Design a protein with these regions (language model features):
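Short loop/turn motifs that connect adjacent beta-strands in outer-membrane beta-barrel proteins
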Residues: 121, 137-143, 178-183, 257-258, ...
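Gram-negative outer-membrane beta-barrel transporters
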Residues: 650-652, 657, 662-664, 669-778, ...
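C-terminal beta-signal and adjacent terminal beta-strands/loops
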Residues: 713, 768-778, 799-849
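A beta-strand signature from Gram-negative outer-membrane beta-barrel systems
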Residues: 52-53, 89-90, 102-148, 198, ...
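Transmembrane beta-barrel wall of Gram-negative outer-membrane proteins
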Residues: 162-283, 303, 311-321, 327, ...
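N-terminal periplasmic "start-of-domain" segments of outer-membrane beta-barrel proteins
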Residues: 7-43, 68, 76, 86, ...
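Outer-membrane beta-barrel signature, preferentially recognizing the C-terminal barrel domain
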Residues: 300-317, 499, 503-512, 561, ...
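Extracytoplasmic beta-strand/coil segments of soluble accessory domains associated
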Residues: 46-87, 115
Length: 849
């Protein structure tokens, strides 16, 4: 059935464009495109990408925003995000990955997810590449403008301050001008605001009992059949005001024959003002068991604390690019990009504790798939501020900054997508990166007894549970006022200088690559064969105390490394029929270690009496992961609005990186005198891991086989299944066990959307499923492995188009109120944390003219 431009609009146009891009791509890919209003119907880039086959998202600390991209089940550190062909710097403290909640979806005209690789692509991508193409003035004939405005209501409102409106405003303008409309300009701006709260119900840890006796967890201990008791119950309430601001501009020139030029710049900022309040009750001694799931503690201790985290992530860049045609089929492309990614967090922490007491005893009863029920012996004692003494208060400032300079020169001869016959691509790529991290901490300890009753509590009330006490709230303003009025009541902690210096590091990297790639475009076949030669020079500088027990004296250590990689790649496409396409691909890619793993140390714990040292140190000599990738994809396109595909992939990853803890005996370590037992936690390269998987995708935007109004239904669905064979982790007793999975990598993930379009009305109901994800692997016993439990969330969108320009939208986010849950236990049956972010509802207007 032929559909004209009037009939195809909105979400149908977006899906058609994405299908077309996948069909014409030289590699295995998927994607998402803007619709005719110039909008991807999501608020952040991460939310848009999680609808793409094989993509799942790591949520921002579990609190409701899609932040990092997991592709084909590979955690974010295995993947790369490009904007107009350039890998921009991270806005995190110790990871290389980009925070996608910083980038608005409105920036993108098209996002392609490349799952196989060519020699001209960034090689730091074992899982894949998300390539974002920004808007161009030449996407439209003449002037184009769009405005999008939404007002939102979050179900979970802030407790400590009055809630303010949530929503989004974005605008885009583009036009061509000058002689023959050879010049173009694009301007866009976006503001997003989320005013909400979250509740985290935390248990933290459990103890295991055999015959009424608490067991020390060791790697060989079999906990099957043992009684289980929670050690701590800790509600945490978060008040968050998140804001995203962005500005983007592009000036273009295209003479239509010889030369294209583009000068673009972007500034993106994401801020989070977070107020956290928590109170916990903790066991003292062992549980008195009633049966396997309930009992009581005769004594307990307690703590109440207040934290404020003022976080700002900023990404800014400027880019100049040009394409110069040498002949009818050949051109040279040149690109220069300067970028900076930064992260700053200002922390204020106030802590008050209640000493062990029988009046803080409590009973417990484990629930199935729910939090344990906690029954306090004396709720009045638990809630009395006179029983809590100040432990300390501190301020901490973290600053991380990454500067990059990228320069690319690429030559292409008869190798563009519309070419026929043999072609050639070759190029040189260079990148300079400078990463800096600095922490400054000031902690003050009370010189005497300071109770919370003396300081005063917060007047707000937070009562998360009907069957448990309201939180006893610390008021940071009253603590600060008390400290200012009583400066002699506090002394500086002796650890301030050490904690401020030991975590600092700086990394300088210079990488370059030269590649050559042959191409073939036949009537029914397409192929690429290439080789990329890449080098990486790195210098890492960090501080260590000298001697290791010192809190005031430090020495700088420096480490240099130089590595080279030969990275072959090949892709073959065969149009078996006009509607059926087969793809084969093989490649080698790398995965660079995180900044924290190669540069960041932590303060050592030195016991000069017991002659022991516990430390966590960086490993600047970590080698990058190396992956050999094989892919097979079969794609069927019955028409331009439907698709059915299956893709198989296999990856062998050498030099896998895991964090291991080892204990050795050292004589006179780090300037100390004597023979010490030294326990060291460090990221190291270990054995190989293999991952194989399969992806299924089915799209049909119109069920033409159904009668009447039912024919306007459509659907999209994709499923990714992963089968990893992981490297081994060293346990606390020196034994080895296979990791139960790849970190932050679900073995199963799926998306499904039900579509309906009839006349001016359109609707979309979307479901996103993410399977069990390993978050950390324990070295004492596997029961302490931490996971995100499987979760399914639902979103709904309704739209009414009044005319070609105006559209009214209604959206529901997380309409089933799915709660992210972190679990532990032999069968992941124990709730460790559950995060309630609530539902959100948006009412908006889109207007294009």
């Amino acid at each position: 059935m032929q559909l004209d431009a009037v009939q195809v609009s909105g979400q149908h146009l977006s899906i058609r464009q994405a299908i077309g891009a996948k069909r014409e791509a030289a590699v295995v890919s998927d994607g998402v495109a803007a619709d005719d209003i110039g909008s991807i119907p999501d608020f952040g880039l991460g939310e848009a990408l999680q609808r793409v086959p094989g993509v799942s998202m790591v949520v921002n600390n579990g609190r409701g925003e899609a932040q990092f991209m997991s592709l084909r089940g590979f955690n974010p550190d295995y993947n790369t995000v490009l904007i107009d062909g350039v890998a921009l710097p991270s806005t995190e403290t110790s990871r290389r990955v980009q925070s996608l909640d910083v980038i608005p979806a409105s920036l993108a005209q098209q996002v392609d997810i490349y799952k196989t690789f060519n020699a001209d692509m960034d090689s730091n991508a074992i899982g894949g590449i998300a390539s974002l193409r920004t808007r161009s003035a030449f996407d439209h004939d003449g002037p184009f403008a769009s405005v999008r405005a939404n007002v939102a209501d979050w179900e979970n409102r802030r407790h400590l301050q009055g809630s303010t409106p949530s929503g989004q405003v974005q605008g885009t303008f583009s036009d061509t001008f000058g002689p023959d409309n050879r010049f173009g300009v694009v301007l866009s701006a976006d503001y997003f605001r989320r005013d909400s709260s979250s509740l985290n119900t935390a248990i933290d840890s459990y103890s295991y009992y055999a015959n009424g006796v608490r067991q020390n967890l060791t790697p060989g201990l079999d906990t099957d059949g043992m009684a289980i008791a929670p050690d701590r119950f800790r509600p945490l309430s978060y008040d968050n005001l998140r804001q995203r601001r962005s500005v983007f501009g592009k000036l273009e020139y295209d003479d239509g024959q010889v030369m294209k030029l583009a000068l673009s710049a972007g500034w993106f900022e994401h801020s989070n003002d977070e107020q956290r309040r928590s109170q916990w009750i903790n066991r003292v001694g062992n549980a008195q068991l009633a049966d396997a799931d309930d009992g009581r503690y005769a004594q307990g201790s307690a703590q109440t604390d207040a934290n404020r985290f003022d976080q700002t992530r900023t990404l800014r860049y400027a880019q100049l690019g040009g394409s110069f045609r040498l002949n009818q089929d050949g051109h040279v492309d040149v690109l220069l990009n300067r970028a900076n990614g930064s992260y700053r967090q200002d922390t204020r922490e106030d802590v008050f504790t209640a000493a062990a007491s029988t009046r803080l005893g409590f009973g417990y009863a484990l629930g199935e798939d729910t939090r344990p029920t906690i029954t306090l012996v004396d709720p009045g004692y638990y809630a009395n501020p006179a029983n809590y003494l100040q432990s300390y208060f501190l301020t901490r400032v973290e600053n991380s900054s990454t500067d990059t300079t990228t320069f690319n020169v690429d030559y292409s001869q008869n190798a563009d997508a519309d070419a026929q016959g043999w072609g050639l691509r070759a190029g040189l790529h260079y990148r300079d990166l400078q990463q800096r991290y600095n922490l400054d901490e000031t902690r003050l300890n009370p010189a005497g007894r300071v109770s919370l009753a003396t300081v005063g509590t917060d007047d707000a009330r937070i009562c998360p549970y009907a069957d448990f006490s309201c939180l006893l709230l610390v008021d940071p303003a009253r603590v600060a006022a008390f400290a200012a009025a009583s400066p002699g009541a506090y002394v500086l902690a002796t650890t301030n200088a050490r904690n401020s210096a030991i975590s600092d590091f700086r990394i300088d990297e210079r990488s370059g690559a030269a590649y050559v790639m042959g191409t073939w475009h036949g009537e029914r076949t397409q192929a690429t064969l290439g080789l990329r030669n890449e080098y990486l020079q790195r210098q890492v500088r960090s501080a260590v105390p000298q001697p290791l027990s010192s809190t005031t004296n430090y020495v700088q250590q420096s480490d240099d490394s130089d590595r080279r990689f030969l990275l072959p790649s090949a892709n073959l496409g065969w149009d078996i029929t006009p509607a059926l396409k087969l793809r084969l691909a093989g490649s080698r890619t790398v995965g660079l270690p995180t900044y924290g793993d190669i540069g960041q140390n932590s303060s050592p714990v030195v016991d000069t009496t017991g002659l022991t040292i516990n430390r966590s140190i960086a490993n600047p000599q970590l080698r990058p992961r190396r992956s050999d990738n094989l892919d097979l994809s079969l794609e069927w396109y019955p028409d331009q609005d439907s698709q059915l595909s299956v893709a198989l992939f296999h990856k062998r990853i050498d030099n896998e990186i895991v964090r291991l803890t080892s204990t050795d005996t050292e004589r006179d370590p780090g300037g100390l005198v004597g023979t010490y037992e030294v326990t060291t936690t460090q990221a190291i390269n270990t054995g190989a891991a293999t991952v194989q998987g399969v992806e299924f995708t089915a799209i049909d935007t119109r069920f033409d086989f159904l009668p009447g109004a039912w024919s306007h239904l459509g659907a999209m669905a994709n499923l990714t299944l992963l089968d990893p064979r992981t490297a081994q982790v060293q346990m606390s007793d020196g034994s080895l066990r296979a990791l139960p999975g790849l970190m932050e990598s679900p073995k199963r993930s799926a998306n499904a959307s039900l579509l309906y379009d009839i006349g001016p009305f359109s609707a979309r109901l979307s479901a996103n499923y993410t399977g069990l994800q390993l978050l950390s692997a324990a070295t004492d016993n596997r029961v302490n492995d931490r996971y995100y439990d499987a979760i399914t969330s639902y979103d709904a969108q309704l739209a009414w188009r009044f005319n070609k320009q105006l559209r009214l939208t209604m959206q529901g986010r997380n309409v089933s109120n799915a709660r992210l849950t972190r679990v532990i236990g032999a069968d992941q049956q124990l709730m460790r944390e559950q995060l309630d972010n609530g539902r959100a509802y948006y009412l908006g207007v889109d207007y294009a003219f």
